[in-house]
């Protein structure tokens, strides 16, 4: 056979094998009825589906018991083949006999790739399988025939591929050289070969993939012949026949002039094999499951499946695989600003900080290990987890290792302090939670929560199924980070999630995207020591708070709490809102006080009543110190309270600071400072405390270990605002002086007249003292006036203490804190009796209340307070160290009596009349109205006549008509003008010598014309 013929045959073989390869592309038998209308992702409605996931195939006009899945890759890939063994058939040794000489032909040998090494085949692959389906009855995909199928079922796959390059066999002219290469360029090393010898070489190899069971056998049969035609040596012909799975025939022929010779030939090849385990991995390795692959879905008709005689649908649907690298999201619940500091506004913003708990969501759609997780059992929302196949706590720590060195070992949690790794654990369990809500299927994510707990030792532990996952998104395991308080400010939690999905590892491993890494830092804040600015001493105790970052125990963070609207027409739930919230699961922590050496400080340890696994047996960790509690008195004196056990119990009421319930926003613990206990430590009574502790400060100093900072605050103690008020009388005091007058009829005789004046006025004293009232909340409390004082107009002050007059202030009602008493100011004489027909210029002041009359003699007003108008004095009281006073004005009556009508003179009968009235009505007055006529029209001059008329007033008759009979003076009066005066003379009942007591109440003074008849 010549060389050209061989080339034609070789080209024909290439065509035949290319045609056979094309026929391996999935071809579907025609059906006259059924068609595939759609392939759907039930969660998204699209046609991109993850691996090991439940897809929906929708058919019409046919009932499908199964589907054919054909996986097609648009690119070539390298298939690694592992050589397991090799063998060779040793033929008979022949000797070559030539004329004149004998030569022994050496034993032949063939060398291939060493056993257990890898060779690669570059090829384009195809795979096909038949998989049963599950009828889908869950909305919304209920119209037509809808079936669930597994996108990557674990049933046996039929694979095929062809080599793109020709298989080359090369016989080099060397001695037993061992080499290795791709199977498309496999070397055979041959030395001197005998005549008429058949060589058989068997190579056992399999793809270096976990999904292949058994091995693939490659059989090579080599026959070499050499014939001698003439002597000496002539041409030798070498024929070689290769048999590969009865389909690969390569004729190797080359004519050389000597042995050994060199020959080579080429031919295409196609390989078929079946995989029965972990086909998902093999699909990935062969490029059949990638983000650019296509999977064709053909329905298998009839009820006789898996019979070989069933037909397939007339057409096919398709979907695209989707491979997504993992991602980690950390969600925090933040506080409002005023939860951090009550003085800040109630808003979120730069002042808001997160809780000490974080909810972690791991988005790894390709990492679901069971396709039935996406399916509910009956489609009932109330029983959505009735699926018997549902197992939200599947173990994900099933590592897959590939050539890139990354293993999908799930979540690794590492505690870093500064740049130092403290400890690290693998977190093997994660809860599946759905992030979207429909009637049938869900997209799932992994969820868990991280909570920091202060501890005396460092550790990372977890508690499984603290809250079962549910439709609200709440749930997942709780990961507890136990950390020493001094390390917290430099701590970082490093979360490393290595996706266990083989496709993610295969495609994203080379670029390190198969691993998601995030850091969870804890920001440590300087604590806030909150104490009220001012409290009354009468309060038994007052609250303080230690407010810091939330180190509280056992919270669960709701990542996405969904609010839904149900559409009655479509029977769908639509998500209308999401928010993040925190739920307090169980247990409140406490701060326990302990004593320090020397009793100068008190240690604070946090105690968790319900601790997670591996928490220290003491259940507590030291978090801070109360460095000191001091009292600063109003005068500036400072006294430190030693925090001995007895003083702690007395002053702080208890050695346990409770966590404020029900949901403290922070590490918020309350303590009570007992004022009663402080009084006992200082050895003072409650009444003494009202004075001793008034305007003093309680100062507390606190040291926080986590932030390494010291804060302090103080509270002022006051006897509550105490006020004393005096309500002055509504009218002023009056005094009415008098002047002695000698009766013109009886010279030298005293004429006595009466003036009755009520000079008693009430004064209300009001004391407001809430602290005093709370000393006995259920009974009425009384107190006494400490002092009464009088201040005269010239500044003279007269004091009178409570021993002289025990005036009592009585509380208006129990615990009201309002105390009242009524004092009276009255003008008295030197004998201490009220002024009633007594000399007004000898008036005195008496102060008393209705229960006890106490007269205070201040001396003669005529001596101490000159009898001039607009003079005043003050009466004041002192109660509880507070003073109040009221001013009393002394007003002189300018005229006791005044005229209310003009003076009228009747020249016929000589009568001069005038109507007068009392200047201060309502009192009884008596005396004389004196008319004096002077011998001139203007003063100074001498009186020529005096005439008096007796008068009196009463409370009911305040007016009086005075008529003077001047008929006997008519000759000298009529027709003339004289200066006259009309004066009211009011004379007291008693008279003390050498004292001016009289007074002229001027009714009229001036020139007056006495009229006369006309023409006279």
UniProtKB/Swiss-Prot annotation:
Localization terms from the record: Secreted, Cell wall, S-layer
Q: Which family is this protein grouped under? A: Belongs to the Sulfolobales SlaA family.
Superkingdom of source = Archaea
Keyword tags: Cell wall, S-layer, Secreted, Signal
Record's signal peptide: 1-30
What inducers act on this gene? Constitutively expressed. The level of slaA transcription is much higher than slaB.
Q: How does it assemble?
A: The mushroom-shaped unit cells of the Sulfolobales' S-layers may consist of three SlaB subunits and six SlaA subunits.
Entry protein name: S-layer protein A
Q: GO CC annotation: what is one? A: extracellular region
Function per UniProt: S-layer large protein. May form the highly ordered outer sheath.
| Chief location bin | secreted
């Amino acid at each position: 056979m010549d060389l050209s013929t061989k080339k034609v045959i070789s080209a024909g073989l290439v065509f035949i094998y290319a045609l056979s390869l094309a026929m391996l592309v999935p071809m579907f038998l025609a059906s006259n009825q059924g068609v595939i209308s759609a392939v759907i992702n039930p969660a998204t409605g699209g046609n991109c589906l993850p691996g090991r996931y439940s897809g929906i195939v929708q058919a019409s006009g046919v009932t499908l018991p199964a589907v054919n899945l054909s996986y097609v890759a648009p690119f070539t890939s390298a298939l690694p083949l592992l050589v397991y063994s090799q063998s060779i058939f040793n033929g008979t040794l022949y000797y070559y006999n030539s004329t004149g000489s004998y030569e022994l032909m050496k034993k032949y040998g063939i060398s291939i790739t060493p056993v257990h090494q890898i060779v690669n085949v570059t090829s384009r692959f195809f795979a096909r399988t038949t998989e049963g389906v599950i009828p889908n009855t869950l909305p919304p995909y209920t119209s037509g025939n809808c079936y669930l199928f597994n996108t990557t079922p674990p049933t046996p796959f039929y694979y095929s591929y062809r080599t793109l390059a020709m298989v080359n066999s090369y016989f080099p002219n060397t001695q037993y050289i061992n080499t290795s290469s791709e199977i498309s360029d496999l070397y055979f090393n041959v030395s001197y070969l005998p005549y008429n010898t058949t060589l058989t070489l068997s190579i056992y190899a399999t793809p270096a993939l976990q999904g292949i069971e058994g091995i693939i056998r490659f059989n090579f049969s080599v026959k070499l012949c050499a014939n001698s035609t003439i002597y000496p040596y002539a041409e030798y012909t070498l024929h070689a026949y290769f048999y590969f799975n009865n389909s690969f025939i390569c004729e190797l022929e080359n004519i050389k002039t000597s042995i050994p010779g060199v020959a080579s030939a080429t031919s295409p090849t196609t390989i078929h094999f079946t995989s029965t385990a972990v086909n998902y991995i093999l699909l990935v390795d062969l490029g059949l499951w990638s983000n650019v692959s296509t999977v064709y879905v053909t329905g298998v008709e009839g009820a006789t499946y898996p019979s070989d005689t069933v037909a397939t649908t007339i057409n096919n649907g398709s979907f695209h695989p989707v491979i997504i690298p993992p991602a980690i999201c950390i969600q925090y619940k933040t506080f409002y600003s005023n939860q951090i500091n009550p003085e800040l506004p109630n808003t979120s913003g730069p002042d808001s900080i997160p809780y000490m708990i974080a909810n972690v969501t791991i988005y790894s759609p390709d990492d679901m290990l069971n396709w039935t997780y996406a399916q509910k059992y009956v489609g009932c929302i109330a029983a959505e987890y009735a699926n018997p196949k549902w197992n939200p706590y599947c173990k994900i720590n099933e590592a897959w290792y590939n050539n890139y060195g990354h293993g999908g070992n799930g979540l690794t949690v590492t505690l870093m302090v500064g740049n130092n790794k403290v400890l690290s654990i693998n977190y093997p369990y994660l809860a599946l939670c759905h992030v979207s809500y429909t009637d049938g299927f869900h997209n799932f994510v992994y969820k868990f929560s991280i909570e920091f707990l202060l501890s005396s030792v460092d550790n990372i532990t977890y508690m499984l199924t603290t809250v079962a996952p549910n439709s609200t998104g709440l749930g997942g395991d709780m990961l507890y980070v136990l950390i020493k308080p001094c390390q917290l400010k430099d701590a970082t939690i490093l979360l490393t999630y290595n996706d266990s999905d083989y496709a993610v590892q295969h495609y994203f491993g080379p670029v390190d995207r198969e691993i998601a890494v995030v850091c969870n830092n804890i920001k440590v804040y300087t604590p806030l020591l909150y104490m009220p600015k001012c409290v009354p001493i009468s309060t038994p105790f007052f609250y303080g708070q230690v407010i810091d970052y939330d180190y509280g125990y056992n919270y669960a963070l709701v990542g996405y709490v969904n609010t839904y609207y149900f559409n009655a027409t479509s029977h769908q739930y639509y998500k209308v809102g999401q928010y993040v919230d925190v739920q307090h699961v169980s247990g409140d922590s406490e701060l326990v006080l302990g004593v320090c050496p020397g009793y100068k400080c008190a240690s604070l340890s946090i105690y968790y009543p319900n601790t997670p696994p591996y928490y220290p047996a003491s259940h507590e960790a030291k978090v801070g110190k109360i460095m000191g509690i001091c009292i600063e008195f109003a005068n500036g004196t400072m006294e430190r309270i030693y925090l001995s056990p007895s003083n702690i119990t007395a002053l702080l009421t208890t050695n346990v600071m409770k966590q404020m319930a029900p949901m403290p926003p922070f590490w918020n613990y309350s303590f009570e400072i007992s004022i009663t206990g402080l009084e006992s430590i200082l050895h003072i009574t409650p009444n003494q405390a009202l004075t001793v502790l008034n305007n003093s400060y309680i100062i507390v100093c606190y040291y926080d270990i986590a932030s390494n900072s010291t804060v302090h605050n103080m509270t002022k103690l006051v006897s509550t605002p105490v006020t004393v008020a005096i309500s002055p009388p509504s009218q002023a005091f009056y005094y009415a002086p008098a002047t002695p007058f000698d009766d013109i009829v009886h010279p030298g005789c005293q004429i006595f007249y009466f003036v009755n004046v009520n000079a008693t006025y009430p004064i209300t004293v009001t004391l407001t003292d809430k602290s005093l009232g709370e000393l006995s909340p259920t009974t009425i409390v009384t107190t006494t006036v400490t002092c009464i004082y009088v201040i005269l107009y010239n500044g003279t002050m007269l004091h009178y203490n409570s021993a002289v007059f025990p005036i009592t202030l009585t509380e208006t009602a129990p615990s009201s804190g309002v105390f009242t008493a009524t004092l009276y100011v009255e003008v008295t004489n030197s004998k201490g009796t009220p002024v009633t027909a007594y000399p007004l210029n000898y008036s005195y002041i008496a102060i008393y209340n209705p229960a006890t009359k106490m007269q205070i003699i201040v001396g003669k007003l005529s001596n101490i307070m000159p009898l001039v108008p607009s003079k005043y004095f003050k009466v004041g009281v002192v109660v509880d160290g507070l003073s109040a006073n009221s001013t009393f004005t002394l007003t002189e009556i300018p005229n006791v009596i005044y005229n209310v009508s003009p003076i009228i003179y009747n020249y016929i009968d000589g009568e001069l009349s005038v109507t007068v009235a009392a200047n201060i009505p309502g009192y009884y007055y008596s005396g004389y109205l004196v008319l004096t006529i002077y011998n001139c029209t203007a003063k100074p001059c001498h009186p020529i006549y005096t005439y008096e008329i007796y008068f009196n007033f009463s409370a009911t008759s305040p007016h009086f008509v005075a008529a003077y009979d001047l008929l006997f003076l008519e000759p000298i009066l009529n027709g003339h003008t004289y200066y006259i005066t009309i004066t009211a003379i009011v004379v007291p009942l008693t008279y003390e010598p050498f004292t001016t007591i009289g007074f002229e109440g001027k009714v009229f003074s001036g020139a007056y014309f006495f009229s006369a008849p006309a023409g006279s």
